[in-house]
Regions:
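Structural recognition of alpha->loop->beta junctions
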Residues: 27, 96-103, 127, 209-217
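A contiguous loop/helix-start segment that scaffolds small-molecule binding in enzyme catalytic cores
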Residues: 2-3, 61, 72-76, 132, ...
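Residue-level signal for well-ordered alpha-helical positions
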Residues: 43-44, 119, 176
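A generic local structural motif
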Residues: 14-20, 38, 63-65, 121-122, ...
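Class I S-adenosyl-L-methionine
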Residues: 1-110, 115
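Class I SAM-dependent methyltransferase SAM-binding "motif I" and its flanking Rossmann-like core
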Residues: 1-3, 83-157, 201-202
Length: 277
């Protein structure tokens, strides 16, 4: 018996992985958070399966269902939104599964920040503009941030920030980040990414809070902050496809014999294993 933590993606049922859907189709127990995972995802469960919306349940309630499935020798599809490894609250479930000696597997899903970038039609890592993305949140009613993970510390890097679970904390975010990024730094609020009512608010650190208040957005939103969100045109091309960039799969023009003789003819020097930036 195995518990499968399955990432359903951020909302669009078509974004679940083939493996994730296949496992849902096979499991006799399917547990999902109905407030974050669309029913269309768990509709793939087999006829007669016990499909449970866990949105109103406690951790003890959830583990009791898993224990019952374990006693019956039935696999469990534990379906989470986005990717389970990011703010998925699976660590406490895994801890209890280990205590109960129950096997588990994690099936990755499309994270909300990646789906949002796709919808915005942007690359978040632009050569010499932004090469780092920090995924974080701010502390409000939830658990405190660990020492050293304060927003000020991340702001000092100048990296693109993807701030989760914090749309009601924009006043504090603006206060902390403005000295580092500037009041005119672009900000995008990605609301309910992947759902039919998704939409995006574009602004700056100085203007975005008013736009969010006017739109009455209070939850299920991701905050992007950083210069890469601008329509950047003045940046160098990636080295990966530059005509002068030589690697094992593309030697210098006119000298094909170099392919086999090159000392760099190793797997780590192929395009798939280099960023090209």
């Amino acid at each position: 018996m195995t518990v499968f933590f399955i990432g359903a993606g951020p909302g669009d049922p078509d974004l679940i992985t083939v493996k994730g859907r296949r496992l849902i189709e096979q499991c006799r127990y399917c547990l999902y958070a109905g407030s974050l995972v669309p029913e269309a995802v768990v509709d793939a469960a087999p006829e007669g399966a016990e499909v449970v919306d866990t949105a109103s349940l406690t951790l003890d309630d959830i583990m009791a269902i898993i224990a019952r499935a374990h006693g019956e020798g039935e696999n469990v599809a534990r379906v989470h939104s986005g990717d389970p490894s990011l703010y998925g609250a699976i660590a406490e479930q895994i801890r209890r599964l280990r205590d109960m000696d129950i096997d588990y597997r994690i099936i990755p899903g499309v994270p909300a920040y990646a789906a949002a970038a796709a919808e915005m039609g942007v690359e978040l890592t632009i050569p010499e503009v932004a090469q780092s993305i920090i995924l974080t949140r701010t502390a409000m009613k939830s658990s405190a941030m660990p020492k050293g993970e304060e927003l000020e510390n991340f702001a000092r890097t100048g990296a693109t920030l993807a701030i989760h679970l914090s749309v009601r904390n924009l006043r504090e975010i603006e206060r902390v980040l403005t000295p580092y990024y500037g009041a005119d730094c672009p900000v995008v609020i990605a609301y309910r990414v992947g759902w039919p009512d998704q939409h995006f608010l574009h602004g700056t650190l100085a203007t975005i809070r008013r736009k969010v208040l006017d739109a009455k957005i209070t939850r299920t939103a991701l905050i992007f902050i950083g210069p890469a969100l601008n329509e950047v045109k003045d940046f160098r091309d990636s080295a990966l496809y530059d005509k002068d960039h030589v690697h094992v799969l593309r030697v210098q023009r006119g000298n094909q014999d170099e392919r086999d003789q090159s000392p760099d003819n190793t797997p780590e020097n192929t395009p798939e294993n280099t960023t090209g930036n």
